[in-house]
Regions:
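Long alpha-helical rod scaffolds of large eukaryotic non-enzymatic complex subunits
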Residues: 57, 64, 241, 245-294
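Charge-enriched, short contiguous segments at helix-coil
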Residues: 187-200, 204-264, 268
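Alpha-helical structural motif
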Residues: 13, 57-60, 64, 71, ...
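Short non-catalytic regulatory patches outside canonical folded cores
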Residues: 98-202, 210-211, 217
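Amphipathic alpha-helices that form helix-helix packing interfaces
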Residues: 61-64, 68-85, 116, 120-123, ...
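Eukaryote-specific, cytoplasm-facing alpha-helical/coiled-coil scaffolding segments in long proteins
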Residues: 95, 99, 141-158, 226-238, ...
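Charged alpha-helical initiation segments
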Residues: 1-113, 226, 274-281
Length: 294
């Protein structure tokens, strides 16, 4: 399939970044799944028309999705910078660190990759909060809510909540099955995931967030080698392996945001067919222009 060519930006830096996003299939644009074509180099995906008896719900849904999109694209750029900018940064200057002789990685650029993974993973539970709000769910307290349990009745994970039981929304079902890759509290769900690398990704994220994840340069002899300098407390990874895991987490976040957008659009189509127009509160929302993003 051939598409018309479009500009990727004004500067070489912008063009290189957008070309990388295209090649890694990271734009929030379904056309990017068809290939690295310049027509897909824009994050056009949004919720579409959202209706409601109260305008506040419309503003909340659109605003929440806006925020998640902004966090995603920011994580994407941080990952890109962390992967390709290997020049020392002035913020690291005169920060005393000790050499543990196992080729550790300590730098602002490496932290960008760590931050990108944290930001990507934080989107999943925010999506759960969005689902809870949009579908008027109250069976799980907000402080216990996550992408793995939002679908179920409060007493267990073997019965779907009434809002989802038999619900014919294929994008929502896609999001449900994607959540199986992200179960943090059940080995059963992760090990039966369709993604064979789901457990490694989950465990790495948990160690990054709650423990001691140590990155190493390629010269490191590896975690299984006998060494008296072995760091037994750390979960150790080669820098390149962690970078690949961070990229995978960003791709999952992209998929989740796409599924969510398509799911809400389907819900709104059904709502339009079944609700009396007089009960709806029409609300016209314009675009937030690029020059306002300061």
């Amino acid at each position: 399939m051939e598409f018309e060519e479009y500009s990727l930006g004004d500067s070489d830096e912008e063009k290189e970044y957008r070309q990388w996003c295209l090649e890694q299939t990271l734009f929030l644009n379904p056309l990017n799944d068809l290939g690295a074509n310049s027509i897909a180099a824009q994050d056009i995906l949004h919720l579409g028309s959202v209706s409601g008896e109260e305008s506040s719900k419309i503003v909340s849904c659109v605003g929440f999705y806006n925020q998640m999109k902004q966090e995603y694209v920011s994580a994407r750029y941080l990952l890109y910078e962390g992967l390709y900018n290997h020049e020392p940064h002035f913020s690291d200057k005169d920060v005393r660190l000790e050499n543990t002789l196992d080729y550790p990685v300590y730098s602002f650029n490496a932290e960008k990759v760590r931050i990108a993974m944290r930001m990507a993973y934080s989107l999943f539970d925010k999506i759960a909060s969005f689902i809870q709000y949009y579908f008027d769910l109250s069976h799980i307290p907000s402080h216990k809510l996550n992408i793995g349990n939002v679908w179920y009745k409060s007493q267990g994970r073997n019965k779907l909540a009434p809002a989802f039981d038999g619900h014919e929304n294929w994008a929502l079902r896609g999001l449900f099955w994607l959540s199986k890759d992200l179960e943090f509290f059940s080995e059963m769900y992760v090990e039966s995931s369709m993604d064979p690398g789901a457990k490694e990704l989950r465990d790495t994220r948990n160690e990054l967030e709650h423990g001691y994840l140590k990155l190493h340069e390629p010269m490191w002899i590896g975690p299984d080698a006998e060494s008296r300098l072995r760091d037994d407390l750390a979960i150790s990874l080669y820098r390149s392996d962690f970078e690949e895991l961070s990229l995978r987490s960003l791709r999952k976040a992209r998929s989740a945001l796409i599924y969510l957008s398509l799911a809400i659009q389907q819900e709104e189509r059904v709502k339009d067919e079944n609700l009396d127009d007089e009960k709806l509160a029409p609300m016209r929302l314009g675009r937030w222009e690029d020059e306002w993003k300061k």
